[in-house]
């Protein structure tokens, strides 16, 4: 057990370092580069009246942005999460925590995840890999993770390709959907199911919605490739070659968004995976997202300073607002109907 705990910590340290220092981008594009807004040269809107506010999980957001799940469990991760939480609270946006599995075996790591005292007002998302339900994690333990950080929802992330390219990864993905359904019905708060960079298909979305999942984070291809991250962690040539061969795997984010929105007009969708700017976020809103998530550039900024992170988030928000005004969109509902060309 101690060996497994140490491996969890070591893996989290590796993931931070690799994401900060290596090129781990998918060779696929997110797809949003193919969408272009029709410029409105006469919007008849005062910039000060452009309204980016929305609600998510019953809480108000100043902008439809999620700091996507990244890290936890280590001292460096604690510092990053504290900065992320401070700035998320200041900016009025949502935040997801990294995988909290380690907390089930290492209670002392709670200090690297517990940020509610820093961010009392924002939507805060707990997180664990869905496959852990096949390896002994129970609905009661999922509720424990939620309670430990006073979360507004629990993310169950689907990372099958990442697990299969880890030498220590979990291989048993059989009969997982019934266990997800069990967690959905056990928890006192909503369950979000999230991919990690390879997209949700129409068929998977249908199954998850039928199981009672309340929010989907499509996390398509076009951003971080976790198989490429694992390629850098590989300890031998074979492991490296296996992981590297999936650099262009997955459903591009735009395609996944369209598929999932076709399944349901009502389910809240978080769109993430390869979004680089508020302009990309605006495109996601236009195609059917409720909020959009980013991680990579926030991680790099948060590892440096709170001020740099706040500047990065302000950049995203300003890009979004300018896009809204230049499309004649006073609100996010207006943006969802803005003219585009493909």
UniProtKB/Swiss-Prot annotation:
Substrate binds at residues 11-12, 99-101, 162. Its EC number is 5.3.3.2. It catalyses: isopentenyl diphosphate = dimethylallyl diphosphate. Keywords: Cytoplasm, Flavoprotein, FMN, Isomerase, Isoprene biosynthesis, Magnesium, Metal-binding, NADP. FMN binds at residues 68-71, 99, 127, 194, 224, 274-276, 295-296. Disulfide bonds: none annotated. It is found in: Cytoplasm. Its cofactor is FMN; NADPH; Mg(2+). Gene3D superfamilies: Aldolase class I. GO terms for biological process: isoprenoid biosynthetic process. Its main location: cytoplasm. One of its GO terms (cellular component) is cytoplasm. It is an enzyme of class 5 (isomerase). InterPro entries: Aldolase_TIM, FMN-dep_DH, IPdP_isomerase. One of its GO terms (molecular function) is NADPH binding. CDD domains: IDI-2_FMN. Mg(2+) binds at residue 163. Homooctamer. Dimer of tetramers. Involved in the biosynthesis of isoprenoids. Catalyzes the 1,3-allylic rearrangement of the homoallylic substrate isopentenyl (IPP) to its allylic isomer, dimethylallyl diphosphate (DMAPP). Belongs to the IPP isomerase type 2 family. This is Isopentenyl-diphosphate delta-isomerase. It comes from Rickettsia peacockii (strain Rustic).
